[in-house]
């Protein structure tokens, strides 16, 4: 990677470190998502504690945190590998934000935004997988994990030159969901709708 690409990746990390969930909840007078609900500063938890409009604002901002640096990097002439590292930097910022004591979200929306510029085919299949699993199961976490496992295959099919960096991002997402995977295995994960289970 060039020195410019490394600096740009760090800038993407700083942008990703802006926790929209915390900021939106503060502006809207809602509880801190890091201390309420699932304790995850992400759109799904904000939906639980603050409603759909607050969650939508968080989701859009988180998507843009990943999409903007990758789009700009593309027009700045970064290589495919460097663009992948920029996407990874944005996701790392969301998950481990330097501005919020490294307590961040799961990175799903930011990863979606970072991967979407690769192409319409990748974006459509990625979104379609998440929606299908979510509609069938009601589990946001399960939708994210299955999507993360399948997205590298979609990328390999449509844009194989991006497969390795996208796989790194998806591995990070699966790792970040390890607690959710354990709760799903034990039948203790909460659905977005329907009867909620106790996570203790």
UniProtKB/Swiss-Prot annotation:
Subcellular location: Cell inner membrane
Catalytic activity from the UniProt record: an acyl phosphate + sn-glycerol 3-phosphate = a 1-acyl-sn-glycero-3-phosphate + phosphate
Main location: membrane
Coiled coil: none
EC number assigned by the record: 2.3.1.275
InterPro entries cross-referenced by the UniProt entry: G3P_acylTferase_PlsY
Keywords: Cell inner membrane, Cell membrane, Lipid biosynthesis, Lipid metabolism, Membrane, Phospholipid biosynthesis, Phospholipid metabolism, Transferase, Transmembrane, Transmembrane helix
Molecular function GO labels: acyl-phosphate glycerol-3-phosphate acyltransferase activity
PANTHER family listed in its UniProt record: GLYCEROL-3-PHOSPHATE ACYLTRANSFERASE-RELATED, INNER MEMBRANE PROTEIN YGIH
Described function: Catalyzes the transfer of an acyl group from acyl-phosphate (acyl-PO(4)) to glycerol-3-phosphate (G3P) to form lysophosphatidic acid (LPA). This enzyme utilizes acyl-phosphate as fatty acyl donor, but not acyl-CoA or acyl-ACP.
Protein's name according to its UniProt entry: Glycerol-3-phosphate acyltransferase
Originating organism: Actinobacillus succinogenes (strain ATCC 55618 / DSM 22257 / CCUG 43843 / 130Z)
Gene name in the database record: plsY
